[in-house]
Amino acid sequence: MDYIIDYKEIVEQAPAEEPARQYYFMDRVRELVEMKKQEGYAAHCMVEVMGCQMSAKDGEKLLGILERCGYTVTEDDRDADVVLFTTCTVRENANMKLYGRVGRLKHQYERRDGMIIGITGCMMQEKDEVEGIRKRYPYVRLVFGTHNVYKLAELLYQTLVTGKRTFEVLEDTKMIVEELPSDRRYRFKGAVNISYGCNNFCTYCIVPYVRGREKSRNATAILRECEQLIADGCLEITLLGQNVNSYGNDIPGSTSFPELLAAVAELPGLRRVRYMTSNPKDLSDELIEVMKTHPNIERHIHLPLQSGSSAILKRMNRHY
C-alpha cells in the first residue's frame, strides 16, 4: 500500500515550541506505524546502550519515545524494525564494539524490509566518525548526536516518510527539553539528569567536546521528575551529571547542588539517594553537612582524584 503524505505540509503544521513539537511528531509516527501494521509490519524496536550512566539515561528516553510512537520493545535485534545504538567515545574499544554490532546487522537490514538502524550518543559528535559511518555503512539510516536526542520522533518521521538517510548532529545547544517519555529499566530505581555537559576541559577528557558546555536543569523540574518516579514506585534515585558538584553555577541565583540534594532526600517515600559524578575542586563543606544530616543519602562519594602529584594535576587541568 502506498501512503500519500505531504511531508512539507506535515512539518509546516508542527508546533514550534518544545516539547509540543516532539509530541506532534510522535503522533504522526504512530499514525504511520498503525497503517504499516495493516501490512504485517511488526513495529518492534530495540535500543542498545554502549556507555556510561548518561548514555543509559538517554537510552531510557529513546525507548520511551519509540513506545509513544507505537513501537513494542524487543530484546532480539532479529525481530526489530528499529534498532538504535547510544554510543560512547571515551574508550576506543567502545567504538570497535559499535562497528562490529552494526556490521552484523547488515544481513538483517537486507532481509527485513523497512528496517531502520540508527546511531546516537557521544561517538556521533565526532565528525570523522560520522563521515566514516556515512561512507562505510550505507544501511545506517539515522544518525544524531547528544544535543538532539529529544528530536528522535521528528528525525524518525523524516526518515520513514522521505525514505532518505537522516544525519543531524548539532555542535552544541543551550536547550533542555523537559517532559519527554521515558522507559525505566528497573521499577524500583531510576536516574534523573540534573545537568548536561562539562566546563572543566581536563586535558585528557573528550566529554566537554561531545556533551557540550555545562547546562543545569531547573530545580523545580528536577524535583517534579523525582516525585513522579516515587509515585511510580521508585525507591532509589541517582542524580546524574558530568560534574554534579557544580550544578547551578551556570544560572545566577540558582539552587546549589547541596540544596538540591537535600530537597530530593527530603521527598516523602524516597529511601535512597545517590549521585555521580563529581570533581574534587567543587566539593564543599555544605555538601558534607547535607550528607551527614540526611541518612537516606548513600554514604559514598564518587571522587576521582586522578593523581597525587600537584605537577601532574596541573598538566591535567584539574584545578586542585
Predicted regions and their residues:
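Proteins enriched for Cys/Gly/acidic motifs involved in redox and nucleic-acid/cofactor modification
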Residues: 1-247
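Conserved SAM/AdoMet-binding glycine-rich loop
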Residues: 114-119, 128, 231-320
